[in-house]
Amino acid sequence: MADNPSGLVIETYKLTKIYQNRQIALNDVTLSIEPGSVLGLLGPNGAGKTTFLRLVLGLHRPTAGWVKLFGKTMSPNAADLRRRMGYIPTNPQFPAGMTPITYLDYVARLFGLTSDSRKPRLASLIRAVDLLPVSGEPIAGFSNGMTSRLAVAASLINEPDLLIWDEPTHGLDPEARRSMLELIKRLSREKSLIVSSHNLSDVDEVCNHAAVLSRGQLIYNGSLQDLKGRMRRNHYELDLEGDQKAITKATAAIKNMTEFKTVSLKQRRLELRLNDDSTNTSALANVFMTLADSKVTLVSIRSVGQQTEQAFLDLVEKEESRGFARAYQVEEAA
């Protein structure tokens, strides 16, 4: 703890990366990751996720700001810090002629493991990722799932404290994806992880914190629960009972209400989308009164949309709107 007074696994301050003096890939990102955290790194393509990971890994130097791992500043020369990390890139590639045994032995040598420690470590990892039956087979014939499991074993060979996995479920079939998620859950009991992903259901299942990047800026950093709490609950489905003519008449009346962006009826299911400036409580109260006046029974009502995904989309949409407004103001000033 003396070497790491903050106790944080990762700490960044005003982290910025500009390529070729013109492309701002990452802008003023400040965040911290505590031990035991499983951070879901989210953002659309081009948001800055890969740049952020490269800076954390020490593969690039920041233009401004800094990254600290375990209380020490990360840089391309900080080999001691990289030894405490395990990394999986998107779509990992391996030498086709090697086998799992020869490849993992090669990685272990790079980390300086002795012969006596390499053999039991390799055997344990190969069993753990279920590659024992093919441990002597060329990697060239491996499926995506087998390749991903080999990447997991390679990222664990140095017994790292921090795992950084970039799109670990990308390209996997449902069974392989499920195995990967279960593995992340098990590892999270003893390690800190950063999981970069486009699959929001995966993040929702295995992560307890989220960082959302948009156009190089950090637009959210906090718990997944708080992220869901930011969701606009403006999309509802109502199941109805009653005379079909009465339901149709009530729907027509609801369509005339100004609170709703869209109103659609499919048989006895009414779908409502509120305008952004509408108050949910009063709008739904008007709907309930209209249904009651038309002798239509409301059987059930539910908010639609996967919560993490909707909250993420809302954040990105708001940030894009702010970006447009800023650009418009600059244009007007000019």
Question: Positions of the model-derived regions?
Answer:
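Short, surface-exposed acidic/glycine-rich loop or hinge patches that mediate macromolecular interfaces
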Residues: 20, 72-75, 218, 241-244, ...
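Conserved beta-strand edge residues that scaffold enzyme active sites
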Residues: 122, 140, 268, 305-306
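Alpha-helical elements of the RecA-like P-loop NTPase motor core of helicases
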Residues: 96, 248, 310
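Non-catalytic surface loops within mature trypsin-like serine protease
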Residues: 35, 133, 242-244, 276-278, ...
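ABC transporter nucleotide-binding domains
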Residues: 7-12, 17-214, 219-220
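C-terminal coupling/interaction segments
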Residues: 2, 276-334
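A short linear hydrophobic-aromatic micro-motif
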Residues: 130, 178, 259-263, 297-302
